[in-house]
């Protein structure tokens, strides 16, 4: 028996013209352009070898120092300074190279573990649903998360062309960002778009 009270959900979802809403906290900018707010997600797209990972590395470096790196500016609240980075495509060796690049861009030492960056490689996990559950677990069980990067979001689905799977994945992103008040930065190759 379904016990969901749709009347309560419906009433809670209504927006009134007299309601007051503030712009969600802007946490990532490129120049004057807003590229990230808490409670939302964004997608970097481009062809293979189009420097998507480099740009995301610069964004993460800016978030790591909570300041400017190249053209990116980050301003996360102190309670949202932890960064989770998930790579679904590369080997641990290549993931470590990306992590070192992030640290160099942030002008931080590459021989000392960064306090608020957790970098996870998920390539060896074959089941896309298990990858997704690991990401969900980390988001909900890591203190002070403000930024989550998913490099290779297409690897969280079995079939990129399946609209049901795509809708469920986008629903997860919306739920995670909303419930945890975080920004999720995803990356996908243009061949998958």
Regions found by a protein language model. Name each.
Residues 141, 167-190:
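Substrate-engagement module of ASCE P-loop NTPases
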Residues 77-161, 168, 175:
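Conserved inter-motif catalytic segment of the P-loop NTP-binding fold
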Residues 5, 118, 179-181:
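Short, flexible loop motifs at catalytic/binding sites
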Residues 2-102:
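The Walker A/P-loop phosphate-binding site
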Residues 55, 165-168:
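Alpha-helical initiation/capping and key positions within long helical/coiled-coil segments
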């Amino acid at each position: 028996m379904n016990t969901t009270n749709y009347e309560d959900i419906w009433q809670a979802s209504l927006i009134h013209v007299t309601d007051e809403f503030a712009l969600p906290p802007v946490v990532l900018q490129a120049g004057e352009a807003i590229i990230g707010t808490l409670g939302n997600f964004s997608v970097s797209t481009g062809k293979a070898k189009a420097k998507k990972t480099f740009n995301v590395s610069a964004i993460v470096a800016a978030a790591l120092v909570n300041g400017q790196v190249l053209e990116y500016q980050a301003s996360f609240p102190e309670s949202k300074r932890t960064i989770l980075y998930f790579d679904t495509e590369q080997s641990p060796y290549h993931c470590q190279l990306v992590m070192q690049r992030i640290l160099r861009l942030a002008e931080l030492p590459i021989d000392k573990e960064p306090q608020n960056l957790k970098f996870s490689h998920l390539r060896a996990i074959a089941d896309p649903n298990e990858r997704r559950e690991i990401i969900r677990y980390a988001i909900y069980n890591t203190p002070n998360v403000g930024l989550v990067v998913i490099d290779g979001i297409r690897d969280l689905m079995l079939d990129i062309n399946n609209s049901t799977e795509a809708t469920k994945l986008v629903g997860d992103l919306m739920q995670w960002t909303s419930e945890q008040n975080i920004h999720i930065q995803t990356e996908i190759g243009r061949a998958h778009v």
